[in-house]
Amino acid sequence: MKLPKLLLLASMMSPILATSSYAAPYPSGVTLDETQEITLNNGAEVTSIDPAKQAAEPAFNLGRDLFEGLVIQDKQGKTIPGVAESWSVNDNNTVYTFHLRDAKWSNGETVTAQDFVYSWQRLLNPSTASPYAWFAAIPNIENSQAIMKGDAAPESLGVKALDEKTFQVTLEEPIPFFTKLLSHPVLAPVHKATIEKHGNRWTQPEHIVTNGAFTVSEWKVNEKLVMVKNTHYWDASNVVLEKVTWLPIGDANVVLNRYLAGEIDQAVSIPAAQKKKLIQQRPQEVASTSASLGSTFYYLNTQQGPTKDVRVRKALSYAIDRQLLTSAILRNGGVPMYTLVPPQTDGFKSHTPEFATWNRHKRIEKAQQLLSEAGYDKSNPLKLTFTVPTFSMDVKMATTMAGMWKSRLGAQVTIKQLEPKVFYALKEPTDITRGGWTADYNEASTWLDIFVSSGEYNDSRYNNPQYDELMARSKTMSNPSELYLQAESMLIEDMAIIPIYRPGNDQYLIKPYVGGYELTNPESSYYRKNVYVKAH
């Protein structure tokens, strides 16, 4: 793995220095508008903006702007300093020491090393019930697994404040991508006194204290969340935007209509039926995304119902025409997938499964054969429940897939639509559940860790001791690629999921007066601190 910072060898420690110079907030020659405000769509209402309670991309979008961790990412996904202006690691790569800059909370108080100690302990504490606690355990921080299981006190976590500005982390085993993990929003600090005073209401606009580029001024659930510039942010002089209004709209058609009416400044998902025409009519508003580290798949319940039978799971996967879905339904640059991990992931290239090499006719024939062997026919049709959020494209995809299964397998599929907030909180998966993952960090384990038997987001309820062993062994290796390949091949052979597509290069609409908002980060980690409004 590439080290994100310059490594300088010394006798006992290897200081990693912040070599990135911060660019000017906007290019020379640009005239700024007097009103620095934008309105964006977040896709859904969030369950929480508390870093420890965030669990999906809409919340992470807000989290990156409100709270800043030790490091952040640049527009290409490289790790750059955040609250930590430099750090060092010992010769064994097990002790990291972070040196904090003069950062402030939005109430003017100093961000300290103890804030990180408190926040990371709180994240892993079972009483917090963080849906992303598992993520904090990935880096092998001393005692993290035991704390998460309730077998050790949160105070035993291998983190300490050496002084107000020095935060130290001790790992049980070295992990080559440790610093890459640290830009994730759930590892940002929170303000202890505010939480202790206001409890679960600490994130309300009248109470919240943040350390990111913005803070919250207004939040009307299911209507809008308004952020304003945090004047105490350490890099506030380079933050141009004064206000960001986020809307929780799940329907791409509604988003587009509001964009065309001038009420939203960006439309990332253009409905396929209107896309070609709009791109031709508005060339000055067209921008392109780069292929992000994402993977869209569908969970198959491996523990109960018809999908408990691997023959049924394989039949469902084989019967899907991925090329048709991506070219005729999605029409967003998506690339068909037959495995889990995207090919542009650092240090990893999936083995192509045999069924991916078959032609369409052979796949359907094999699917029908497997379903017959499983005991299903016209007199005993396969009946399934397929759960998706109410996003228009998810419903359209599910309807098309259900049609394929009906025409090719005689399956009777009931599509269960849930509001996004309800869907993301779903605890018990049905036969088929909409899945997908955008990388938390650029390494194959961000996807493969999902499917260990104890995985928080293992909605397939996949339970394979051999898979668990491979992933456990991978944590102690400096180059675990071969184990990752074995694990992914096992997952696909067991067909715990139906991989469908990965994001490719796509085009979207953005108002020509919005600058600094290039969608080029492979992990889709974007920061509104980089955005500005040009005079128009």
What are these model-predicted stretches?
Residues 85-134, 168, 258, 306:
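Aromatic- and charge-enriched surface segment that lines or borders ligand/interaction sites
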